[in-house]
């Protein structure tokens, strides 16, 4: 690491592009949300740069590891992504009344990508001089190599005013205790955006961000748990309301308190390991971090299984109207937590879903009775939900956390290839007719390849928390096999 400094440097847009192409730009997900700008946001920002309007500072932390200097984006991810997206032909911009794409012959980096067949010029093309002027725009970038604590403080002060981040985004950003880490892990797993490390290349970010209108990348937002089940609006999901819900549920579980008393101040305390609540939560997580993570993800997975089997969403099961959706969902999840903690699971998904669907009116009425305190209302509603679903629960063996890990790795198949290998199976299948006698027999060549991959994985330097994994496909039935 180089000596400490905090200076505003004038980097050109071309400098940023060259860093991106050489994989020299990284994103620390402890600080940065996923990509959230819409196409119109990006177009407006690029228009500002072309018109040479001033823009806010961008903050990066500089690393010098093995004599290679790289930069982590602490503040300004959305702006840098807009610049790179425009220069890589993802969208056109209107200049002087004419729409056009960036001229990729205007910079050496984009021209090289074109020559390598990695970038194709789209039509119509902007005037080359406009693109040359654009690449020369000087960006106000704060580069620093301060310690993590100082970077945290700088980041929070940068975002302490305005509407850059939601209250929860700011609470979560830069928090390093076990509670915040677990909220991040559960949330990203449920969203389908979990990565093996918090630090990823800028190139990876579009693949793990929620899709946006007019932008062809990322995770289809309508397929995400919270949207698929009608719990959150698209706007609330982009503002990290899903993370806040998980933080409330996790806080209530760890502190053994009603959901109703997990206030904003309690949440703030949970993110601070120096507070009493923060210490209680982190002390418990030292002993059972992985077990609690598995428990939460298991429930989310089971709720998805209900939908897959019955085509009935949580919204159809629980919500009689749009009122108090998240409150009712959290109480339902609390009941599921209690039951799964006692090693119980749903026996008949269809009957379970139908019973809840037919009872949702009484659940809502019970919840909206305001003759008692919120604590008593919560208890009464939890008791009612428990009574309704109790007859549908069966005793089960303890859950294997490896199931969650496999699902997470499969979701990462397009971006995480170093630590995971995917094999279609151990046997021959769909062989040409003259080799049909091999059908169903053990494929020794494939077994040998798997052994070689396993041997190679042992020689890869990696975090001990992320072991190498070989996932082999197995058909559920004969039709799946064929």
What kind of feature is each model-predicted range?
Residues 17-22, 51-60, 216-226, 413-433, ...:
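Active-site-adjacent bridging/hinge elements
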Residues 61-66, 145-148, 252-257, 341-344, ...:
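Short, flexible beta-strand-to-coil junctions
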Residues 2-14, 28-251:
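Basic- and aromatic-enriched surface patches that contact anionic nucleotides/nucleic acids
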Residues 1-20, 369-383:
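N-terminal extension/subdomain marker
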Residues 130, 135, 274-482:
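Conserved N-terminal catalytic/coupling substructures associated with nucleotide/phosphate chemistry
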Residues 54-55, 163-167, 192, 196, ...:
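Intrinsically disordered or highly flexible coil/loop and linker segments, enriched in small
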Residues 163-182, 272-281, 361-367:
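Short, cationic low-complexity segments
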Residues 192-339:
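Polyanionic (Asp/Glu-rich) segments that form extended negatively charged tracts
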